[in-house]
Amino acid sequence: MGRRRIRSRIRKSHFYTFKCLRPKTLEDQGPHIINGPGYTRIVHCNQPHLHLAKVLRYTSNYVSTTRYNLITFLPKCLYEQFHRVANFYFLVAAILSVFPLSPFNKWSMIAPLIFVVGLSMGKEALEDWRRFMQDVKVNSRKATVHRGDGDFGRRKWKKLRVGDVVKVEKDQFFPADLLLLSSSYEDGICYVETMNLDGETNLKVKRCLDVTLPLERDDTFQSFSGTIKCEDPNPNLYTFVGNLEYDGQVYPLDPSQILLRDSKLRNTSYVYGVVVFTGHDTKVMQNSTKSPSKRSRIEKRMDYIIYTLFALLVLVSFISSLGFAVMTKMHMGDWWYLRPDKPERLTNPRNPFHAWVVHLITAVLLYGYLIPISLYVSIELVKVLQATFINQDLQMYDSESGTPAQARTSNLNEELGQVDTILSDKTGTLTCNQMDFLKCSIAGTSYGVRASEVELAAAKQMAIDLDEEQGEEVTHLPRTRGRMHGYAKMPSKTSSDIELETVITATDEGDQTQSTGIKGFSFEDQRLMGGNWLNEPNSDDILMFLRILAVCHTAIPEVDEDTGKCTYEAESPDEVAFLVAAGEFGFEFTKRTQSSVFISERHSGQPVEREYKVLNVLDFTSKRKRMSVIVRDEKGQILLLCKGADSIIFERLSKNGKNYLEATSKHLNGYGEAGLRTLALSYRKLDETEYSIWNSEFHKAKTSVGADRDEMLEKVSDMMEKELILVGATAVEDKLQKGVPQCIDKLAQAGLKIWVLTGDKMETAINIGYACSLLRQGMKQIYIALRNEEGSSQDPEAAARENILMQIINASQMIKLEKDPHAAFALIIDGKTLTYALEDDIKYQFLALAVDCASVICCRVSPKQKALVTRLAKEGTGKTTLAIGDGANDVGMIQEADIGVGISGVEGMQAVMASDFSIAQFRFLERLLVVHGHWCYKRIAQMICYFFYKNITFGLTLFYFEAFTGFSGQAIYNDSYLLLFNVILTSLPVIALGVFEQDVSSEVCLQFPALYQQGPKNLFFDWYRIIGWMANGVYASVVIFSLNIGIFHVQSFCSGGQTADMDAMGTAMFTCIIWAVNVQIALTMSHFTWIQHVLIWGSIVTWYIFLALFGMLPPKVSGNIFHMLSETLAPAPIFWLTSLLVIAATTLPYLAYISFQRSLNPLDHHIIQEIKHFRIDVQDECMWTRERSKAREKTKIGVTARVDAKIRQLRGRLQRKHSILSVMSGLSGVSASTDTTSTTQHS
C-alpha cells in the first residue's frame, strides 16, 4: 500500500525520476506522440477500467482539505504545540514533576499544561472538523455518469474515475476537470462561470471539437472511445496542451475545450465531457497551495523575551543550587533534625557537587512560573476577538456591494499598526475598474468633448486659479512631468477648446459632470452620434473603426427577453465598454456562435444584420499586449482586426498604414495625460493564398504538444500581425474610487509612504497621481529612464546599467543638496528601467533614492516586478510593508509583503484569496490602519508586557522564599494556588486588556492620524519599555515578599496570639499578588467597559470565593488550607491591611512614572486624553486645531500638503509684494527729496 502511495505521488510530478514509472507510448498510436517530461498523461475515454493498470494508476476524485486525519491528528497537532519553546519547557517540567525531586504536586504542573495545550488542540480539531464536513459535503455530490451501453446513472463525485463520460446540467458544478465533447447548443459551445477558481464573474465561452459534435445524446456514447494525450497535472488555470486521437485522426486540444472542476455551467442546458484530471490532480486543487507563513514583528520579538526569561530562570536556578550546595557543606552539621550522622545523597556535606546538580533540577521546576504558560493561547484568543471586531465594523462595510471587511488571518492584527510603506496597485484599487468609453481618435481626428474625472480633479489639486485664467489668452491644464502647457484659443472652436471649456465650467460647478445614463458610455460628441459620422470626411475609416469595436473581442451577449436589450459578459471591463459604445454608435453585437458573430448595423435606415465568420482568434496575453481576430465578411473578404497597446501596434504598421500615426500619437498622449486607458485599433486585408499558407502553419503550432507550444503560437501570430493599417485609438475612463484622495491624505498625515505600482503608461499614472494628491504642483519629479547612448563602444546592457546608476546617484545627490525644508520629491520609473534598477549591484541605491522621495510611481511594471519591488522595500528597509491590490497580477506582491490586503473588486477574488485582510474599497484602508491597526498594536504590546510583569512578580517570590529558607527547594504556595494563577485568576483581565483597550476613540484616531506613528516607532514594545515592565515586576515581588515576611514572621498576627505558619503566610502573600497584578492592569487601561470591570474585580472576588470553598472541603482534600480564610486570615485585621499596604507600595512607582511623563514629557495620546477629558477642545478650539496641525508638519503628499504648499506660496507672494512696495516707497521718498533739492538750487 505504501509503495502505491509513493508511486501515486510521483505520478503527479511533471518530471519522472524513475523511467519504469513513465507511461508507455506506442509508436503506432499516431503521428503526434507526446514526448518529453511533463506531457505524459494518457486518458482512455469511456474506458476508465484501463487506468487501473499500475503504470496509469491515477488519483481518485476524493478531495481532502483537512490538515489532519484520525491517525495523524495526535502526533501532528502535538508537534505543532510543542515546537513552541515555552510549551516544550512545561512538557519537560510536567514529566519531571512525577519524580520525587519536584517541589510541587505533579498535577499542579500537568493540569495547566493539559488545559492550555488541550484548548489549542481543541481549536485545531474544531477548525479541521469543519473542513472535513465541507469535504464530505463536496465529495458526496452526485454526478450523472455513463455506465455503459448508452445508459447514464447517478454516482458520487468521489467515485468518479479518469476516463468516465459525465453529463453536467445547467447551474451544476463540474465534478472534475473535463474535456468538453458536446453541448445542448448545435455548435457545441457552452458558458462557464469560474468564480470559484479565479473569482471572475464574467462568463467564459468553451467550444468542443467539431468531430465530437454528434455525441449529443446518451445513446451516442454506447460505442464511443478515444485517447487523450496531454500535459501532466499543473496549477496553471489558463493553459492546456494535448491531443485527442479519435477515429484514426489526431485533433489538437487547447484551454477552450477544458471544463475545470468547481466552475459552474451557465446559460447551457447540458454538456457531455470526459474526465481528464481527478481529485488533487485537478487544477483547482493544484492551486490550493498554502499562503506563505507570516509572523508579526511583535511575535518575533516575543520569542527573544521568552529566551530572556529562560536565561533568568537558569540564572536564579543556578544561584539557588549553588546556595543549596554551600549551605549543605557549611551548615549541615547544625541541622540535627536532618540526621547529619546518617546523611542522604542529597544532603551529604562531603559531596556538595552532587547536591548542587540534583537541586538544579528542583530549582528549574520551582521557578518555572517565570515563564507564562498561558501566553500563547491568550494571545490567540485575543487576536481572534480582535479580528471579529474588524469583520463587524460597519464603518468598513460597503453597502453597494454588500461586502464587509474581513480579517482572513488573525496573526497580523498588531502588524497593521506598524506599517511604514504602502505599495498599491492603481487599476481597481485607486480606480474603480468600471470603464466608460469617453473619447476616441479616428483617422487623425479626436472625438469626445467631455472632460475626464482625472482632468477635473488634477486641475483642482494643482490649485489652478480658473477665475484668473479664464480671462487670459492661454488656459493651462496639468501636463506630463509637472509642466504647464498651453493651448492657444482659435477663432473656431476645436475639440480641445470645447474640452477646456468643459473643464472650467465643471470645475466652477463643483466638479460634477453630467452622466449619459448609460453604464460604460460617457461619450459626448454629436459628430459621431445618431449616424452623423456619415457626414464626416473620413466616413470609411470611421466605419472600419466601429466594426473593429463590434467584432474584435471574445465577449458573450445576453439578450433580456423582456426589454430586448443586450448585456455582455467579457473577459475585461474594457471590452464591455467598447461593445456598449459600438451599440450606441449603431453597431450592436447581438449573437455569437462557434464560427460567427452577428452585428446589427443601423447607421443608415433600417437595421441590417451582418454575419462575420470567425476564422481564428489570436488571444490577448500580457506578453503580447494585443488581440486579433481573423474574420470573413459577407463579401468574402478576409480581414485581420487587431487592437492593442499603442507601442505594440505602431511598430507593426505598414508604410501606407501610418497616415494617421502622428495625429493619433498626439491624441494618445493627451488621453494618457487625462488619466484615460488607451488602445490602438488597426486592420489588415488578406488574400486567400496568404491566409491558407499562414493557417496551415498556425494549425501545426496549435496541434503541437510540448513546452514550446505557446512560443510557437506567438511566433506564428507575429507572422500575421504585421503590415497593419492604423485606424484610430480608444480612450476609456477608469474613475477614481470614492474617497481615495481623502484616504491618501490621512495615510500621509499618519506618516505612511505610498508607492504606486501600475501596468499603465506613464502619462496615465502621473495624472492619477495628481488626481489623488500623490503628486502636486511644485513637487520636484525625478524621472529614471533608459537613454540611448549614441556612439558608445561598450556593451549596450552595461551602458544602460551604468547610465541608470548614474541617474540614481545624481538624483540622490540633488536631494541631499536641497536646502528648502519643504521641498518634496517624487520618483517616477518605468518597467524597462526598473529591470536594471532591481539588479543586485543597483537595487540598494535605487531603494535609498525611493525612500528619500515623498512618493514613488512605477509604471508599465509586470506582476513579477511588483513582487520584486515589494521584496526590496521589505528587506531593504527592514520596516513593515503593506501591499494592496485587486487583481490576479497583484497576488505576487500581496504574498510578498508583510501584510497583504485584497480588494474585492471587478477583476475577481484571486487577490482576496491570497490576502491577509480584505476590504471592498481603498478608502477603508484608512480605518483599517489608523484605527484598528493602532488599537491592535497597542493592545497586544501592553498585553505581552503585562504578562511578563505578572509572572516575574509571582515567580520571584518563590525564589526569595527559597533563599529565606536556606535554599531548601520548598514552595511557599499551595499546589492549588499554582494551578489557578495563570489559567484563571490572572488570564481574563489580560484578555480584556487585549480586546477592549482604547487609548483614544476611533473618531480621535481619524482626527489625529499622527498618533499612528507610535506603532512604526514601536514606542510600546521597545526594549526600554519591556525591561521597564520586567523591572516593575522585580520591584513588586520584592515589596510583596518583604512586607509579608516583615509582618507575619515570628510574631502573632491575630487576637488569639497565634503566629503565621507557612501556609498562612503563603496564602496572605498570594492574596497580595492577586491584588497587586489586577490593580496594576486596571491602572494601565485608559478605557473601561462593564466587561473589564467584571473580569478584573471578578478575578479578585473569585480568589476569595475559591479560598473559602476550598477551605470547607475535608482536610484530606484541602490539607493545611482547611478553614484558612474563615478561621485564620479573615478575622485578622492585619491580613486586610497588608493587602492595602501592598497595593499602595507596588503601584507607587508606576503612578510616579506616569505622572512624571504626563507632566514633563507627555506622549501625543496623553495630551489628547486630557483635552477630551476636560473638554478643552470645546473651550479652546485654537489649541485643539494646533494639536491636530502637528500631523501635517512632515507631510509632503496629500490634500493637506497641497494646501500647506499653497499657503506658503501665497505668503511668499505677500512678502515679496510688501518688499516691492517698501522699495517703491523708499524710491519715491528719495525721488521727492531729490526734486525738492533741485528746486531749491534752481531758485
Swiss-Prot record:
Catalytic activity line of the entry: ATP + H2O + phospholipidSide 1 = ADP + phosphate + phospholipidSide 2
Alphabetical keyword list: ATP-binding, Cell membrane, Isopeptide bond, Magnesium, Membrane, Metal-binding, Nucleotide-binding, Translocase, Transmembrane, Transmembrane helix, Ubl conjugation
Keyword set includes Zinc-finger: no
Active site: 425
Disulfide bonds: none
Domain of life: Eukaryota
Protein's UniProt name: Probable phospholipid-transporting ATPase 7
Naturally occurring in which organism (per UniProt): Arabidopsis thaliana (Mouse-ear cress)
